[in-house]
Regions:
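Acidic, Ser/Thr/Pro/Gly-enriched interdomain connector segments
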Residues: 2-12, 27-29, 33-96, 152-156
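A glycine-rich, coil/turn loop motif that links secondary-structure elements
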Residues: 68-72, 92-103, 118-125, 251, ...
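Stable alpha-helical elements in mature extracytoplasmic
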Residues: 75-79, 98, 102-105, 121, ...
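Extracellular LysM carbohydrate-binding repeats and other cell-envelope/extracellular binding modules
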Residues: 102-104, 108-140
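Peptidoglycan-targeting cell-wall enzymes and recognition modules
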Residues: 149-165, 169, 177, 196-284
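Active-site or metal-binding loop neighborhoods of secreted/extracellular toxin and effector enzymes
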Residues: 277-319
Length: 319
């Protein structure tokens, strides 16, 4: 058989219905060679365009996520375990970072720790996550952390393991997420322990209600009652907490939603932004305690001595 290849199609002279006729004399040729060639070229052009589109999508995915093809399921499980420890993830540790739950957890972590909110893993995200988790674990496992947690042991609903967890997460946020030194973080945490005991669902005490947890409190931006880690009180600040938690798909009592709210305050609120900048310029416990008290938290009772005392105790444990 005399086979010719034209545009990827095979044709043969002996395909003719009657011997002796050449290809130009065929009456029942099943296809036209020129049309077939044009069809094949067009098909190739379409495939080329589709491939280019896919190549661009693949390149964009790599560029935005930093995902390396060498990542393994175990690598991704480690990411999920770390997100779980920091309170961002509660789903199955299956190594799939493309589920809605995993992407939400990553995006919320990125928001809290000041990274681009892609919802995808990258080397930068992985490094920050590892640093935050390492910091959390080191603090949570401290044998003498009870010196700090006992500051709120007088409350009837006190649970040492719970305060240990909250404190460790808060310390990791301010040290790894907000870049504070040990002196600065001690001053900030001295204030937070005095205000809320590091409990995110703590509402301002009333004459009849003095607990760490206020699970029955109905969050109201206009009621003038302090709430959360730093006891957000005025309408604008409580509204920001409500909006931030909603954007993250979390309740207002979630500790990470409150971290994200505080970060946003330091970035957009002129007074808080200026005070935060000043705090970070001074590496002293008393200065950071005072600035956080009077310029950032600004409670009615300016009890500096109590807060500074707590800050020094925290520093003695955390240094």
């Amino acid at each position: 058989m005399n086979v010719q290849n034209v545009g990827g199609y095979q044709t043969g002279i002996d395909y003719l219905p009657a011997a002796g006729k050449n290809i130009s004399e065929r009456e029942d040729v099943s296809f036209n060679v020129e049309e077939a060639t044009a069809e094949k070229v067009n098909e190739g052009a379409i495939k080329t365009a589709e491939q280019k589109t896919q190549d661009l999508k693949d390149a964009y995915a790599v560029m935005t996520s930093g995902v390396n093809s060498t990542r393994t399921t175990n690598d991704n499980k480690t990411v999920q375990r770390r997100l779980t420890q920091l309170g961002f993830y509660s789903g199955s540790v299956d190594g799939n970072l493309y589920t809605d739950a995993s992407k939400k957890a990553l995006k919320n972590f990125q928001r809290v720790y000041g990274l681009a909110q892609t919802g995808q893993i990258s080397n930068m995200v992985q490094d920050k996550l590892k640093a935050a988790t390492s910091c959390y674990r080191a603090v949570a496992s401290k044998s003498d952390l009870g010196t700090i947690t006992s500051m709120v042991s007088g409350y009837s609903d006190f649970k040492e393991s719970e305060i240990r967890d909250y404190f460790a997460k808060t310390w990791a946020f301010f040290r790894v997420g907000m870049g504070l030194t040990v002196h600065q973080a001690s001053g900030v945490l001295g204030n937070i322990m005095a205000e809320s005991g590091c409990v995110p669902d703590n509402a301002q005490d009333t004459g009849t209600n003095k607990k760490l947890h206020d699970k029955d409190y109905k969050f109201n931006v206009s009621d003038g009652r302090g709430y959360g880690l730093i006891q957000w009180t005025i309408k604008e600040r409580k509204q920001l907490l409500k909006d931030t938690s909603s954007q993250m798909g979390l309740p207002v009592n979630d500790i990470n939603a409150q971290f994200a709210c505080f970060r946003k305050e330091t970035e957009r609120d002129d007074m808080t932004k200026s005070a935060w900048k000043t705090l970070k310029e001074h590496d002293m416990i008393d200065t950071s305690t005072g600035i956080f008290l009077s310029k950032i938290e600004n409670p009615k009772v300016q009890n500096f001595d109590e807060r500074y005392s707590k800050a020094k105790i925290i520093y003695s444990v955390m240094k």
